[in-house]
Design a protein with these regions (language model features):
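TPR/TPR-like (Sel1-like) alpha-helical repeat modules
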Residues: 84-108, 114, 118
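TPR-adjacent "capping" and linker segments in tetratricopeptide-repeat scaffold/adaptor proteins
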Residues: 1-7
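Structural signature of tandem alpha-helical TPR/SEL1-like repeats
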Residues: 17-30, 52-64, 86-98
Length: 118
């Protein structure tokens, strides 16, 4: 990751920490243009879209993250949360179960499965 792209990525992460999701999207989209296959950028951008309530954009980022890293338990969980926000609970639960199988010690993942199953 070049210094400029890394700076944009760090700026976006800092904006997320400050609760500035919309500003983070701008920084992270610029970083993504420079490194479209960088999983860390895609993850942060997915989170920014999620926090902005932009479910389809978040879904696209988390799906791309899974293309880049299919065994990323958090990516499955985040995609599940995004799908659930769109009313797609059955599809979300598939990703929660995949996340839980990749990280069996996660109480958070198991809790989502239980809640969706009810």
């Amino acid at each position: 990751m070049s210094e400029t792209i890394y700076s944009l990525f760090q700026q976006g992460r800092a904006q997320l920490k400050r609760g500035q999701a919309a500003q983070a999207i701008v920084s992270l989209e610029k970083a993504k243009r420079g490194e479209p296959e960088k999983a860390s950028i895609r993850e942060a951008l997915g989170i920014a879209y999620f926090r902005s309530g932009r479910w389809e954009a978040a879904e696209a980022e988390f799906r791309k993250l899974l293309d880049l890293s299919p065994v990323n338990d958090y990516a499955h969980y985040a995609l599940g949360r995004t799908l659930e926000k769109q009313g797609r609970s059955r599809e979300a639960n598939v990703h929660y179960k995949l996340a839980a199988s990749l990280s069996p010690d996660s109480a958070q993942y198991r809790a989502r499965i239980k809640e969706v199953d009810e």
